[in-house]
Structures are given as C-alpha cells and as structure tokens.
Amino acid sequence: MSVMFDPQAAIYPFPPKPTPLNDDEKQFYREKIKRLLKERNAVMVAHYYTDPEIQQLAEETGGCISDSLEMARFGAKHAASTLLVAGVRFMGETAKILSPEKNILMPTLAAECSLDLGCPIDEFSAFCDAHPDRTVVVYANTSAAVKARADWVVTSSIAVELIEHLDSLGEKIIWAPDRHLGNYVQKQTGADVLCWQGACIVHDEFKTQALTRLKKIYPYAALLVHPESPQSIVEMADAVGSTSQLIKAAKTLPHRQLIVATDRGIFYKMQQAVPEKELLEAPTAGEGATCRSCAHCPWMAMNGLKAIAEGLEQGGAAHEIQVDAALREGALLPLNRMLDFAATLRA
C-alpha cells in the first residue's frame, strides 16, 4: 500500500550557519562584490528576508530589494546580462523562467525553502490527478516543476483577489503548498479550497501564548502578521499581508510600536520606511520551547558576503540556475496568467 507524502511530518535538516566575518573581511568582500558586479555586467536582487548587510549592498549597487516576484520582474527589465539572486533557489528559478536569456547566479544552489521542499512534484502531481475537477493554484514558493503542473501561480499580495475571481467563475481550487495561507484565503473568500499541507518553518513557529504575553508588555503596539502564520496568530493581527503590504501597513498605522510576525530580515526595509517607530520581533517559541528558525530563514542566511563573491567569481554549475526549456515553457504560462491578472488589479 502506498503512503501519501505528509509535509507536516517532514523534517528538513537546516544548513550550518555561515562563519561570521570580521569587519575587515566584510569590507574586503563588499569591495570585491562591487567590482565583480561591474566586470560581469551584473545586478544584484535581494529578498526582504536576507541579512541587512546584503540588502544594503543591493541598494548601494543599484539593485533591488523586494519579494520574489518583483525581484524577477526587476531583473527581467534591467539591462544587466547577469542577475545575482540573493534568496532561495525557487527565486532563482523564477528569475530564469522570466529571463531565459540571462545568466542567473546564486551564492549557493543549496539555499532551499521548506514550502518548496514540502511540495515534491511527483507526490503533488498525483494529488492533482486525484482531483481533476479542481483548478490548481500554487504559491510562488514552489519549484519550476510544480509551477509547470499548475494552472495559476500566485503571490500572497494578490492571493485573495485571485481566489475571489476563480470562485466567481464557479471553480473549485487546489491550493499549494502553504496550508496557513490557503486557510486564510479560504476564510476571506468562502471559496471551495482543498489545501496541500505544507508550511513555512519560520512562520509556523509563531506562538499565541508567547505573543499574548508580549502584547501585555506592549499594550499599545500594533501586530503585523504574514498570512503564512497559523490562524490563531492571524486572528490577533491589526494588519495581515505580504512583505510589501506589511511595510505599507507599518507606514499607515498610527501606532508607534509594531510587533512584526514574519522573518526578521524585513526589519531593514521596514525600519527605513518608519524610522520613528519601534519594531518588535514576534516570539517564535512557546513556554519552555526552543525555536528552530528564531524568525529567520536558515537558508536565507546562506546568502553571506563571501558566498555572493564566490558566486559571482566562480559561476558554473555550483552557482548558475538552469531550467529545462520544456519545463520553463510550462511554468511560464501560469506565471504570465498571474502577471496579467495583477496588471488588471492595478489598472
């Protein structure tokens, strides 16, 4: 008897933490990266969840700091022939899908994502085959192969609007891979949504009891929550949204103190947006518990200065993203559907 893959039961080994650099080493690699970016006609795109010094370097060199889709869109529009993607592997794949003519380099191809790992293509394809009457919607945090199996790709910033649209057409949905985001979208729309049971190892760790205690210490603080968090955390929020939406909420809310329930990498850009406000990390461990991620993705942490310099200098199979042409074509269709839908929302 075959046993169905259970993302909730999967344990993903974390990578070792990068060796800390001293100030002289940091300066050496910063200068080396700046030189290599010019020599390779490259631009650096970094995710909000990378370390502050990486985001700062992206800014200083004319690059981009954003969510995964905007990183790829920025790279596609940029004149550079090479993109250095500081993030996790699916982000590099998305950049390659949208810019097949460009060289896509990453500090390491071992930078994974628990949502991606928790949705292997063979098991997910079988799951979809078992429900042929449903439209398949997958989150951007998936492999190129999973995207190619989908009808739509979606980001958290437009997930509710897209599912509302599909529901209005009478469509039933398969949602993958994040069960918390899928549950949030279902509750917001009332749509018929069948969720794959994956989760982000960072957001899944936020704890209601610990957060309640923190709220008592800071009773006038607003709570900002990413919808990849458990429902009990989302229900406590003053604002729920994607990374970019949370930064906007930080500016809009009148509160002087903000408790932020997402990866602490976002603090760099959020603090720039609201320098007058105090940002507080939401707790990730319950009573007597020890956090695994401690509100920072361990794979994002692999994007260190030394690794970025090595990626630019060495290139090759250890650093360059490749996507099979047929797979790219299959993944591009649902990605373009999403981009077209997002454009109608902005119109």
Curated annotation (Swiss-Prot):
Q: Report the GO molecular function annotations.
A: 4 iron, 4 sulfur cluster binding; metal ion binding; quinolinate synthetase A activity
Which keywords appear in this protein's UniProt record, sorted alphabetically? 4Fe-4S, Cytoplasm, Iron, Iron-sulfur, Metal-binding, Pyridine nucleotide biosynthesis, Transferase
Name its pathway: Cofactor biosynthesis; NAD(+) biosynthesis; quinolinate from iminoaspartate: step 1/1
Per the entry, the cofactor note is:
Binds 1 [4Fe-4S] cluster per subunit.
Q: In its keyword annotation, does this UniProt entry include Oxidoreductase?
A: no
Domain of life assignment? Bacteria
Q: What EC number(s) would the UniProt record show? A: 2.5.1.72
Q: Which prosthetic group or cofactor does it need?
A: [4Fe-4S] cluster
Which biological process annotations from GO are given for this protein? 'de novo' NAD biosynthetic process from L-aspartate
The UniProt annotation places iminosuccinate binding at 47, 68, 139-141, 156, 226-228, 243
Its recorded reaction(s) are:
iminosuccinate + dihydroxyacetone phosphate = quinolinate + phosphate + 2 H2O + H(+)
Q: Name one GO cellular component term.
A: cytosol
UniProt binding sites for [4Fe-4S] cluster: 113, 200, 297
Record's Pfam families?
Answer: NadA (PF02445)
Its EC top class is transferase
Query: Where would you find this protein in the cell?
Result: Cytoplasm
Give the matching PANTHER family.
QUINOLINATE SYNTHASE, CHLOROPLASTIC, QUINOLINATE SYNTHETASE A
Record-stated family: Belongs to the quinolinate synthase family. Type 1 subfamily.
Q: What does this protein do?
A: Catalyzes the condensation of iminoaspartate with dihydroxyacetone phosphate to form quinolinate.
Protein name, as recorded: Quinolinate synthase
Organism (species): Salmonella enteritidis PT4 (strain P125109)
